[in-house]
Amino acid sequence: MDCVSSNCSGANAMQVLAIDVGGTHVKILASGEKTPQKFVSGPKMTAKQMVAQVKKLAAKWEFDAISIGYPGPVLQGRILHDPHNLAPGWVRFDFKKAFGRPVKVVNDAAMQALGSYKGGSMLFLGLGTGLGSAMIVDGFLEPMELGHLPYRKATYEDYVGLRGLERYGKNKWRKYVFDVVERLTAALEPDDIVLGGGNVKQLEKMPKGCRQGDNANAFAGGFRLWMKEDFHTNFAGGAHRR
């Protein structure tokens, strides 16, 4: 099933607004709508400014609840650190009060992983500024921070994130991506591996056993966060009502 086109409404038919917060743009889509909207983010955008822009763009949309994919660590639905590429002030921001609706916050990689999931055990790796990661096993989501694990002389994301791409060039970077995927596959033994993120397009081919993700799956993941009957998500590691 294509969750974006069908809106993943499920049996509960809840109307959801999914917000994908990025370092350069914020993208939004609501259940029942076909065309995502976006606006520029950047280092000067605060959480309050983001909310104001979203309200403006989504003024004519109807929705009951909100999902936010956040570009940083989230624990128990609470943002742990301000994002590197946005203005400070996100950690204690009350999104529920600001929007006037129930809100669930997850790491952006976790939200895209939810939208990419087809069953069994799936590892999602987001090749972006860093290395986003999440694992789903039989419908239970576990956001991860694999990018910070030691690798060679630094960490995984130092080699396969944007810094690695810029430092080593495309050819070496691709080799590191293949090596990292092979190592994580051996360690975690997933049935399915999805490579997403903005830099996945820099790969000439997919590593063995991998499929390419679609950034639009972040919206599908946002819709799925509020589904109750056909998708069981373990929010202990990454989602909670705020």
Where are these regions (language model features)?
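Short glycine-rich, Thr/Ser-proximal phosphate-binding strand/loop in the N-terminal lobe
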Residues: 4, 8-52, 140-167
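Short glycine-aspartate micro-motif
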Residues: 16-20, 65-67, 122-126, 194
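Glycine-rich phosphate-binding loop plus the immediately following alpha-helix
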Residues: 26, 90-93, 97-112, 121, ...
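Short beta-strand scaffold segments in enzyme catalytic cores
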Residues: 26-30, 72, 114, 131-136
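Residue-level signal for inorganic ion chemistry
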Residues: 28, 68, 195-197, 222
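Glycine-rich phosphate-binding loop and adjoining helix at the ATP-binding site
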Residues: 42-55, 59-67, 72-121, 158-160, ...
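Short secondary-structure boundary segments
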Residues: 70, 127-129, 197-198
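Glycine-rich phosphate-binding loops at beta-strand->alpha-helix junctions
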Residues: 184-216
